[in-house]
């Protein structure tokens, strides 16, 4: 299964619409989550009305010219059931066509508030989106220092829900203010969080930052195979590796060596 998430910062521009369609053709995601569409669900459906493959769409309408959250999925490859809609979260059960294994999927825009966290029970979850929050100062370069209280609250939510923060193999920052020199600010605002019970299997999993020239956020792609056999995996992915502070450095080193 391939899932991408992207804060596109508005889809009224024809140029952004063309670029998004090109990304869909290139990346071929089964599921795509889009934040800040800044348009209505109906307009989003009109934009993709003649696009092939024909993606199904569920969305929160933008409020005026702000906000908007959408999930697109290819019904020939993925089945969705039991939609839950909250102000900043869209979630559903999903599975690959032909598979008997359901995974709960949630697209997020902004850090979940305490009441919204109740949708993350002790079940297999893949949570993705623009959380607009970092877990530590190492995830930000430049700009005003985030408060420890906010970062700790976000980290506590991840730990309490037994989610694992998946690192991207080709970089850290997913947002940049597009300014140079000492005025540049970059942060890791977008991410995939996956339940430990999903991670602690013999699976293939990889997250990567993609090009995204029409927004100040970059798209992120997650590739996950819940049924990968031992022959397909040279080792078992363990959740506790991601709690090692040196893990990100190791991953970046492996990535460079593979080039």
PLM ranges: what are they?
Residues 1-259:
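A shared catalytic/ligand-binding motif for oxyanion handling
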């Amino acid at each position: 299964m391939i899932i991408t998430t992207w804060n596109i910062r508005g889809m009224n521009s024809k140029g952004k619409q063309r670029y998004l369609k090109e990304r869909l053709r290139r990346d071929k995601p089964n599921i795509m989550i889009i934040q800040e569409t800044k348009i209505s669900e109906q307009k989003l459906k009109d934009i993709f009305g003649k696009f092939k493959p024909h993606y199904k769409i569920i969305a929160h309408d933008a409020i005026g010219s702000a906000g908007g959250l959408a999930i697109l999925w290819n019904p020939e490859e993925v089945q969705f059931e039991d939609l839950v809609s909250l102000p900043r979260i869209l979630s559903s059960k999903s599975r690959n066509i032909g598979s008997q294994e359901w995974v709960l999927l949630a697209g997020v825009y902004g850090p979940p508030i305490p009441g919204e966290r109740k949708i993350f029970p002790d079940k297999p979850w893949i949570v993705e989106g623009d959380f607009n929050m970092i877990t530590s100062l190492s995830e930000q370069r430049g700009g005003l220092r985030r408060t420890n209280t906010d970062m700790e609250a976000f980290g506590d939510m991840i730990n309490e829900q037994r989610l694992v923060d998946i690192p991207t193999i080709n970089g850290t920052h997913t947002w940049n203010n597009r300014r140079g020199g000492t005025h540049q600010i970059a942060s890791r605002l977008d991410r995939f969080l996956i339940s430990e019970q999903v991670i602690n299997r013999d699976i293939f999993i990889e997250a990567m930052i993609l090009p995204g020239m029409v927004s100040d956020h970059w798209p992120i792609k997650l590739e996950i195979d819940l049924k990968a056999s031992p022959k397909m995996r040279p080792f078992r992915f363990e959740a506790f590796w991601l709690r090692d502070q040196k893990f990100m450095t190791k991953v970046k080193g492996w990535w460079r060596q593979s080039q």
